[in-house]
């Protein structure tokens, strides 16, 4: 299946197909002329797929080198970026060459940032290997790295030339790594897609049920992301809906220490906490918090952060990218399948941190 991201200045396709990673070279040959390519990945993904993708690209006429770094959210920083820059220079990459981001969200965010800043921008594509990356972070052109102050604090908007999604690679994920991606999938059902929510309701929450329906879950999620990105590429309007649960979720990730709480886990806890307080304030319908909680728990996602420290979380919130002055654009779900922006002051945001 192909989904067109029809952004006027940079349209591209998401290709979703079981087993398509084996044809990565042929796919890329349709996008780029043979040239130098650097595969950016982490050491875990490299051990599984780097050689396979490298050989496929070489068979298609590309000159390929591989850069891998130690896996983990804590490596998504400017230190790693500098190391990638140095590798690209040693390989002699020019503005006519490109980067293949092969991995999960950490790899995709970092490799995209490198591609968008090296020589003021070179071509890149995404081959996501985690559920979170396949349904969310590989699509839409947000790139970035973390700082000690906040998640993704330094970044760019830079669209890839294409996204290649192979649902079969999810079978090599660990249980926790697969389940955390469901945080984003659940979010899509809540903010835009009641049909997806109904599908999730019918699943039993097991790893087997996720893998069996992975292609459908990915397609639904990508269609929602496509709609938001095409209408609002630079995150000024409806694309903000994609941040439901992320305001508190990002604060949890930052205060826990990057890599301790996975992104989808933090999003799940963020959705539950925001909904609980918003429901108490009459801003979200009665019973929705219970529905979100039960859905997250069914798939094995955490719904309560055990190291809840209001002061630390609030400090992290002050660096949120959705803040404009002293106002933060909070995303709420007034009914299943729709979302709204609810501006709150940073002072009011303290209410949403009360357990």
Curated annotation (Swiss-Prot):
One biological process term in Gene Ontology: amino acid biosynthetic process
Coiled coil start-end: none
Annotated InterPro entries: Dehydroquinate_synthase (IPR050071), DHQ_synth_AroB (IPR016037), DHQ_synth_fam (IPR030963), DHQS/DOIS_N (IPR030960), DHQS_C (IPR056179)
GO MF terms, alphabetically ordered: 3-dehydroquinate synthase activity; metal ion binding; nucleotide binding
Keywords: Amino-acid biosynthesis, Aromatic amino acid biosynthesis, Cobalt, Cytoplasm, Lyase, Metal-binding, NAD, Nucleotide-binding, Zinc
UniProt entry tagged with the keyword Ribonucleoprotein: no
UniProt-listed CDD domains: DHQS
Signal peptide boundaries: none
Subcellular localization, as worded in the UniProt entry: Cytoplasm
Keyword Lyase appears in the UniProt entry: yes
Domain of life (superkingdom): Bacteria
Cofactor binding note: Binds 1 divalent metal cation per subunit. Can use either Co(2+) or Zn(2+).
Pathway involvement of the protein, from the record: Metabolic intermediate biosynthesis; chorismate biosynthesis; chorismate from D-erythrose 4-phosphate and phosphoenolpyruvate: step 2/7
Cofactor: Co(2+); Zn(2+); NAD(+)
PANTHER family, sorted: 3-DEHYDROQUINATE SYNTHASE, 3-DEHYDROQUINATE SYNTHASE, CHLOROPLASTIC
HAMAP family referenced in this protein's UniProt entry, alphabetically: DHQ_synthase (MF_00110)
Family in the record: Belongs to the sugar phosphate cyclases superfamily. Dehydroquinate synthase family.
Cited NCBIfam families: aroB
Name of the molecule in the record: 3-dehydroquinate synthase
Native source species: Streptococcus pneumoniae (strain 70585)
Gene name of the record: aroB
């Amino acid at each position: 299946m192909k989904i067109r991201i029809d952004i006027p200045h940079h349209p591209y396709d998401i290709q979703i197909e079981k087993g398509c990673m084996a044809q990565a070279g042929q796919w890329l040959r349709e996008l780029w002329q043979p040239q130098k390519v650097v595969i950016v990945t982490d050491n875990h993904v490299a051990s599984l797929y780097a050689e396979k993708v490298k050989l496929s690209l070489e068979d298609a006429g590309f000159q390929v080198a591989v850069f891998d770094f130690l896996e983990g959210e804590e490596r998504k920083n400017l230190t790693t970026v500098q190391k990638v820059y140095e590798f690209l220079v040693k390989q002699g990459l020019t503005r006519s060459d490109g980067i293949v981001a092969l991995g999960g969200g950490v790899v995709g965010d970092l490799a995209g940032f490198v591609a968008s800043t090296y020589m003021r921008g070179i071509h890149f594509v995404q081959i996501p290997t985690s559920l979170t990356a396949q349904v969310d972070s590989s699509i839409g052109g947000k790139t970035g790295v973390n700082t000690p102050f906040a998640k993704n604090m330094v970044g760019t908007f830079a669209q890839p030339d294409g996204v290649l999604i192979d649902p079969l690679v999810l079978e090599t994920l660990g249980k926790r790594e697969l389940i955390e991606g469901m945080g984003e999938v659940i979010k899509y059902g809540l903010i835009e897609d009641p049909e997806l929510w109904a599908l999730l309701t019918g699943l039993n929450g097991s790893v087997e049920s996720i893998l069996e329906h992975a292609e459908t879950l990915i397609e639904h999620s990508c269609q929602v992301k496509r709609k938001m990105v095409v209408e609002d590429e630079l995150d000024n309007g409806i694309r903000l809906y994609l941040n439901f649960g992320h305001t508190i979720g990002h604060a949890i990730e930052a205060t826990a220490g990057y890599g301790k709480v996975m992104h989808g886990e933090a999003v799940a806890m963020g959705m539950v906490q925001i909904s609980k307080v918003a429901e108490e304030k009459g801003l979200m319908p009665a019973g929705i918090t219970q529905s979100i909680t039960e859905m997250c728990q069914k798939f094995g996602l955490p719904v309560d952060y055990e190291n809840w420290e209001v002061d630390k979380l609030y400090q992290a919130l002050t660096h949120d990218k959705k803040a404009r002055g002293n106002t933060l654009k909070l995303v709420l779900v007034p009914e299943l399948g729709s979302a709204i922006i609810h501006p709150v002051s940073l002072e009011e945001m303290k209410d949403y941190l009360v357990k």
